[in-house]
A protein has these predicted regions:
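Extreme N-terminal basic, low-complexity initiation segments
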Residues: 2-6
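Helical scaffold of the NTase/Pol beta-like nucleotidyltransferase catalytic core
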Residues: 12-24, 29-114
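Charge-rich, low-complexity amphipathic helices
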Residues: 70-71, 125-126, 172
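Conserved catalytic core of two-metal-ion nucleotidyltransferases
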Residues: 88, 92, 96-98, 151-183
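Active-site nucleotide-donor binding segment shared across nucleotidyl transfer reactions
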Residues: 97-148
């Protein structure tokens, strides 16, 4: 069971709020505790005004409540959010496969990070984990090769590729013409 933090100075930043803790429990546990947490959460919020972190959990909530046979008018809205997440993730995963394939064909090792790693490694369902972009780690000695390969493909960056600057940053944002991002 997730508990909210008493550290009020961080609520909304690094610790879960009481509402987020209720939602996380509703999305992750099974049986009556899950249903109870969901009812408490649903009765204490306005669905149109949930915070971003909570909104990202709604697809996982939908899957958990569906597995438990919950019927409620809000289930259709949760389903719509789940389906949108699944669709967006399909597009991002296709883009990810393309980039990883291109880098692999040039003997550049990659490691998936964050959401894409979670989806591939832990979730069987691409709709339960919301992603806005995907993240790939490459060997530091191949960074310039990666930048050149990406620049010759559909991906571009606004980042200055000055060697001295690259040493002091943890990532570079790339974007395609469709507005899809990856770091």
């Amino acid at each position: 069971t997730v508990r909210s933090s008493n550290r009020m100075e961080c609520v909304g930043e690094c610790w879960t709020s009481p509402h987020q803790a209720m939602l996380l429990n509703a999305a992750r546990v099974n049986g009556e505790p899950s249903i109870s947490h969901w009812r408490q959460w649903a009765n204490s919020i306005e669905l149109d005004n949930v915070d971003t972190a909570s909104h990202r959990l709604l697809p996982l909530l939908y899957r958990n409540l569906t597995r438990q046979g919950v019927e409620h008018p809000d289930m259709d809205r949760y389903k719509g959010i789940y389906r949108r997440t699944w669709y967006r993730n399909q597009i991002l995963m296709h883009k990810l496969q393309s980039v990883v394939g291109m880098l692999g064909s040039h003997q550049i090792d990659t490691m998936l990070l964050k959401g894409s790693a979670m989806i591939v490694g832990y979730y069987a369902d691409h709709g339960v984990r919301s992603m806005n972009d995907f993240d790939i780690l490459v060997p530091v000695h191949q960074v310039h090769d990666v930048i050149n390969l990406l620049a010759s493909s559909e991906w571009h960056t606004e980042f200055p590729t000055v060697a001295s600057r690259i040493r002091f940053t943890h990532s570079m944002l790339f974007q395609d013409a469709g507005g899809h991002d990856f770091d």
